Amino acid sequence: MATKIRLQRHGRKGYAFYKIVVADSRAPRDGKFIERIGSYNPNTNPATIDLNFERALYWIGVGAQPTDTARNILSREGVLMMKHLLGGVKKGAFDQAAAESKFEAWLKGKKDALNNMKAKVKEAAVADDKVKLEAEKAVNKARAEAVAEKKAAEAKAKAEAEAAAAAEEATETEETPMEAAAEEAPAAESAE
């Protein structure tokens, strides 16, 4: 039977995640499968892959053909590297212990690279948050200054209005004694 290792789509529209399955090559994409060997979620950064390494190695060993994306996933997880090393053991190029040590060294390098990538993503997110915070502080400061200027202008206008009202009131009080004195003066003249 011609078998393929491929992805079976699940999830909602716009947020797909996949099961990694071994299926007959003639079966539909989301149809019947022989065995589920893992899952793949490309929505996270970096993509989340959960793979049963031994079963994937078995199916590759018996001739299952991976699709392009499944091949990339198997390569990233080291299944294809292990198949390559086991081929060298079969040919007698080196023994099983040497193959294991080479695989461990390769896997350590891959994990270090993945951890570095995760750290860079995290640092970029922190830096982006810091820039956004600084921009928000600048906007808030500008708004506060605008509000302070508006309040100062209102206070100045109110003070000017109060001063004008006080000056007008003072002129009214000054005019009243003069008028009263003027009225008293003609009355005093007429009395004489």
Curated annotation (Swiss-Prot):
Keyword Transferase in annotation: no
InterPro entries: Ribosomal_bS16, Ribosomal_bS16_dom_sf
Pfam families per record: Ribosomal_S16
GO cellular component: cytoplasm; small ribosomal subunit
Biased composition range(s): Basic and acidic residues: 149-161
GO MF term set: structural constituent of ribosome
Species per Swiss-Prot/TrEMBL record: Porphyromonas gingivalis (strain ATCC 33277 / DSM 20709 / CIP 103683 / JCM 12257 / NCTC 11834 / 2561)
Protein name per Swiss-Prot or TrEMBL: Small ribosomal subunit protein bS16
SUPFAM superfamilies, sorted: Ribosomal protein S16
Keywords from the UniProt entry: Ribonucleoprotein, Ribosomal protein
HAMAP family per the UniProt record, alphabetical: Ribosomal_bS16
Region of interest (Disordered), ranges: 149-192
Source domain of life: Bacteria
GO BP, one annotated term: translation
